Amino acid sequence: MTEIEFVGYSAVHPSDFIYDVPNGFTGYLLLLFDSPSELLIDGRLMRTAANSAILYTPGSRIYYRAAGEEYRNDWIRFRSDHSFVKLFPLTNTPFPVTDPEYCHQLFKLLTWESAFFSSESEANITHLLRVLFSKLREGIQNESPG
């Protein structure tokens, strides 16, 4: 089962934007960065490029901020017991996204589906998330050597 807590796309924040949740959330947070960003990973501040993503796992520290310019992202806070989420190959570490526009469109669809609930919404949300996670895995696989 999957439950979307909050979801949004095309979020825009000023160049001094900071988001800090020291103890994380009880669910997952998936971010798709549309601008360069700075993240705190294992106690180190690191810069990530636009067209990157990160999947924060439940209870993980969440800290990200603008990197000196306007900050833009798509995001979803959710709970899921599906294996495509629980077994995602890279968590709490940024990774490149090979088709950010495609993923952006999926965030739009997830937002619309969660906002206009119908009898098919739960199944539709699961299918959309499955496709999104499949596309995100492509970026990880393309980055891996060999």
Predicted segments with their positions:
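Short, surface-exposed, charged/polar-biased interaction segments
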Residues: Y28, N51, R72, V97, ...
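N-terminal regulatory/effector-sensing and dimerization cores
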Residues: T2-N92
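An amphipathic alpha-helical interaction segment
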Residues: I76, D81, P100-G146
